[in-house]
Amino acid sequence: MKRLNLIILSVFNLFFGCKTNTDLSSEEIIYAENNYEFDRTIKLNIYSDSTYIFTSSEKDPRYEKIEKFKGFCFKRLDTIYFKPFEFELTDSEKAVIKNNFIEFIDGKYPLRIKIKKTNFPLKEEAYSEKQDSYSTFTFNSKFYDCFKEDVKPYDLSEKEINELEILLIKCIEENKSKMTRPITEYQKQVIAVKNLQGEIEVWVNCNCKEKNDEFQYSILDYNDGGDCHFNLKINLSKNTYSELYINGEA
């Protein structure tokens, strides 16, 4: 029976183009981790034998909760496929490696996990010099309603990130009566698209800097805080901004 199980596993790996070591040992090829407030952590380990382990842990002075999910996956170029079963936490069939994150793109809710270590080189981020204050998210109408019309997700270049920053500075300068902080005090979350006219539009969510990296994991939403939190739309093709919303305004 043991031999039969090994044969079945080998056939499964061959079918999905996965690499299995002859001695059945496995090498970690990707390690990703998010650290949240209140001692909450999620980790994803992906191995060369086409297996993965996802771990979610929460700690409290009174208890500790740890959950583990195991399954199979394989990597092709910059895409990770979860077969024959979806990634259980989000019911995703695939994820993409983008801007040093594993980004689950087809699940029941958006999830990004920051890559900490790989055994292969990653593409350099377009905004590598500003990665401590910028985080880009891929538009999906299922998750985000900042764009209503038929648009396509768009990846900003380093040049476009710099142009975006100039327009953010301009916005603050032109609204001094409501905005008192320089742009350097904000962490920026951006969603970029190309509209039907071929113009590059960007929704920008700005929040006062925090010590943690949570702004890189998901879009943050605050109900108060005044000009510590604001968002707007920027049209890079026209060099204009619109729909400025500052927390605390009616």
Predicted regions and their residues:
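Lipid interaction determinants
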Residues: 18-68, 81-122
